[in-house]
A protein has these predicted regions:
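Conserved alpha/beta catalytic core and glycan-binding cleft of carbohydrate-active enzymes
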Residues: 1-92, 120, 130, 134-137, ...
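Aromatic- and carboxylate-lined catalytic core of secreted/periplasmic carbohydrate-active enzymes
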Residues: 97-133
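Solvent-exposed beta-hairpin/edge-strand motifs
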Residues: 168-183
Length: 209
């Protein structure tokens, strides 16, 4: 009791295409007011910590957190995830918080802080329309849109660089997008994204100009 590794297996997918389909499917399970208030967790006191499940790779935690903070709902951080605390199944997932800051992953913490600032600064990331744009075996892209503000989130979950060429959806040719996570710019050409390659196991949060 309390071990949830078998909970909702239909929502877990190892492919980008399946993952994006599941993200869209979840949005239709409940009325939108409920969706926007739902608590979105990567882990909790009842589960192994995400960082441990993924073999201690902070890149994967960053990717998951990027989705968590750009998906409809209320992202919730389990204490210590932001500094790299690990832990297996309950009770190991309830380790004491490491108050000694020399034990923290400060780059990871800064990444969490950046996502928090961006979500607070841009209402489209909180309550905007969710539009799937494209997917492949190891990558997904979706758009959040509200009152003319558009943001495109791209996830590269492969061990190789990924050139973003997905369809740009409602974005017009000539649109330039700036990655708010610092990886450069993309543009829209002939209805598709161009001009930006993501390093392995990284994501982009692109703001349309």
């Amino acid at each position: 009791v309390g071990h949830w590794e078998g909970h909702g297996p239909q929502y877990f997918s190892t492919s980008g295409t399946g993952f994006l389909a599941n993200l869209e499917k979840l949005l239709h399970l409940y009325p939108m007011p409920a969706v926007l208030a739902q608590l979105n967790l990567l882990d909790s006191h009842d589960t192994a910590r995400f960082l441990s499940i993924t073999g201690g790779d902070p890149r994967l935690l960053k990717l998951a957190t990027l989705v968590q903070f750009t998906y409809p709902g209320a992202p919730s951080i389990y204490y210590g995830d932001e500094v790299g605390v690990e832990g297996g199944q309950d009770p190991d997932c309830r380790r004491s918080f490491p108050w000694d800051e020399s034990r923290w992953d400060h780059k990871l913490r800064s990444y969490f802080q950046l996502l928090i600032r961006l979500r607070l600064a841009h209402p489209a990331l909180r309550t905007g329309e969710f539009i799937p744009l494209g997917s492949s075996e190891d990558a997904v892209a979706y758009l959040r849109r509200l009152d003319g503000a558009c943001f495109v989130i791209v996830i590269n979950n492969s061990d190789a660089p990924f050139h973003i060429t997905f369809p740009a959806g409602p974005l017009a040719d000539g649109t330039v997008l700036q990655d708010l996570l610092g990886k450069g710019t993309a543009r829209v050409e002939n209805g598709n994204f161009a001009g930006l390659a993501l390093p392995p196991r990284t994501g982009a949060l692109l703001q349309a100009g």
